[in-house]
Amino acid sequence: LATQSRDLRFDLGRVEGYRNFCNKLWNAARFVMMSTEQDEGAGEETLSPYDRWIRSRLQAAIAAVRQGFADYRFDLAAQAAYEFTWYEFCDWYLEFSKTVLQSEASSTEQRRGTKRVLVESLETLLRLLHPLMPYMTEEIWQRVGPRAGRTAASIMREPYPTADASRVDADAESLTNRARDVILGIRGIRGSFDIAPSVRIPI
């Protein structure tokens, strides 16, 4: 955040980094739209711990972004939105969702629940990001919004997200954090022994 009489050096590396962020968000939206094309119909839903985890983490991200705006710390607002989008939604939740959507053992209720959380989380994330990157979020939202049940003509006509304390789930966060630690540990062991990702190993 630049103040008066303070100059910031233009950093092309940061520009490239945010270009990569835009690409990451675009690809995430494509994955969500492709994964939710097949309608599971109305009915009961079952949420996995990972579905509950991302809903819980989204509330924390919303609170952090809103606090950044309230304090006129637009840098902190952008950082909170960036970190949730990249490190939690894209890097982890999208991968977790594949274990439900691509498994023959998953029930219709499980797939229905994961698909709904995918769409609702992305739609909320787009509204959260909109003040920071209005054009791209509007473009994606025009396709995602209707699937999430939104009827406004523009993302600008929809309310800005507010954190919902009822969706904070400490148990899901604890379980998912342990799962992430195990996965990272296995990846580290693979790297230490030069085991290719394609090689299946007993755990």
What do the PLM-derived regions correspond to, one by one?
Residues L1-A2, N20-M33, P49-A61, Q79-V100, ...:
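Core structural elements
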Residues L1-E45, P146-T151, S192-I201:
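Catalytic adenosine-cofactor/nucleotide-binding cores of aminoacyl-tRNA synthetases and other
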Residues Q4-N20, D71, D75-L76, S166-N177:
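Conserved phosphate-binding loops in nucleotide/dinucleotide-binding enzymes
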Residues L8-F31, Q79-Y82, K115-Q142:
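Structured ligand/cofactor/substrate-binding pocket environments in proteins
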Residues Q38-R66, L94-L184, V199:
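Acidic, turn-prone loop/beta-hairpin segments
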Residues Q59, R73, A81, G185-R190, ...:
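Long hydrophobic segments that form regular secondary structure
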Residues Y82-T85, R178-D181, R187, I203:
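Conserved, well-structured core segments
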